[in-house]
Amino acid sequence: MSTNFSVPEPTPQLVKVAESAKEASISLGQSTNKQRCEALTEMANALNDNADEILKANVQDLERSEKEGLNKSLLSRLQLTKTKLKGCIDGVLKVSNLADPIGKRQLHRELDENLILERVTVPLGVLGVIFESRPDALIQIASLAVRSGNGALLKGGSEAKDTNQSIMDSLDKGLRKSNVGSGALSLLTTRQESLGLLRLDKFVNLIIPRGSNELVQFIQENTRIPVLGHADGICHLYVDNSVDIDKAISIALDSKIQYPAACNAIETLLIHEDVAEMFLKKGLPIFSSEGVTLKGDTKSQALGVKNKADESDWSKEYLDLILSIKIVRNVNEAIEHIRKYSSRHTEAIVTEDKMVAEKFLSSVDSAGVYHNCSTRFADGFRYGFGAEVGISTQTLPPRGPVGLEGLVTYRYYLRGDGDLVKDFASGDRSFSHIDLPL
């Protein structure tokens, strides 16, 4: 999305779509767990039945986008292979097997005799989702929206317009076969609609951007609706001096090359000076054979890293087979570097020293902080959340990979029998505040 556009008032047509989504979301939020699970099954079946059409549409999008010069990392995200589509369909079914997030009683308290307070989870209402390139995000978020009883207005990038339309046609077909209906999900197709969406604070309860730093920042600066997301994925891996070199190299490789366009891939590798020579002597040929371009500080260049890293590289999200390397004196310097340049997404340490590991885990303020494992584990599916709506790097919850729990809020129910505050204010009655079983 270009940031040169001012945010216009939503068109009457868009307002009508939003009103319909709001009304449908109320009905969806009151549906039973069984009805929503059946709807997800029908959605998965429809996607499977129309898989060939979806993949054909994706080829059209890829060919057009390549001709238009879409960069390599976005082309990678745009591509929907048969295997990836099958994984998405399986993900829809797995979401249906997750525990119902609606109607969970979080608090049950007697304020006084026959005056009972409850706090119960309820859907947010309507989600506004804006995403670039990744058509699989449409499937993930649509399934989570239905499972959590929320409506959704979904706007994908123009580069994926044919794929997204084919997917939405399939989802709509599945919903029409269920008892839930299709009005809760709507696909927005124009830039004007995506901009107008930001002004729909009367109808939309949460904006979820999935895309570039530029996109997320623009949305955060131009809407009064709460935004769930992260602008950057500048992730770090620190290799300590108390380390198994082979383990460290394999973790670094997985964190970078397993899917370099992902927001949880590392962009900077920090290495303790005591093991830097050993690590780079063994690791450089391996990184080179995998096609990774390395950029290093002066110390790492002296040990064989060919390209120089400048100041801007430490805060750059490459989303490609490029990795910055810096040699540090100790874990404290590594932590200071991360505090200065991290986007607070995911960081990891490789060390056999448990005390150093605990210091790192407790000192680094990111959504995910790992010990002896790849940063690529920062994912809702890998956490067992089912498909994720996104990753949040904000301090307030939800934080990190956000699944169903981030799509519900809560409501207080108080049931009494003619109870009046004046009776408590006068001292005629007093609060018991007894917690009851959930």
Curated annotation (Swiss-Prot):
Localization, UniProt: Cytoplasm
Cell inner membrane in keyword set: no
The EC number(s) this enzyme carries: 1.2.1.41
Keywords assigned by UniProt, alphabetized: Amino-acid biosynthesis, Cytoplasm, NADP, Oxidoreductase, Proline biosynthesis
Pathway, per record: Amino-acid biosynthesis; L-proline biosynthesis; L-glutamate 5-semialdehyde from L-glutamate: step 2/2
GO cellular component, one term: cytoplasm
GO molecular function: glutamate-5-semialdehyde dehydrogenase activity; NADP binding
Reaction it catalyzes: L-glutamate 5-semialdehyde + phosphate + NADP(+) = L-glutamyl 5-phosphate + NADPH + H(+)
UniProt GO BP: L-proline biosynthetic process
Coiled-coil region: none
UniProt-listed Pfam families: Aldedh
PANTHER family: DELTA-1-PYRROLINE-5-CARBOXYLATE SYNTHASE, GLUTAMATE SEMIALDEHYDE DEHYDROGENASE
Role noted for this protein: Catalyzes the NADPH-dependent reduction of L-glutamate 5-phosphate into L-glutamate 5-semialdehyde and phosphate. The product spontaneously undergoes cyclization to form 1-pyrroline-5-carboxylate.
Family per record: Belongs to the gamma-glutamyl phosphate reductase family.
Full protein name: Gamma-glutamyl phosphate reductase
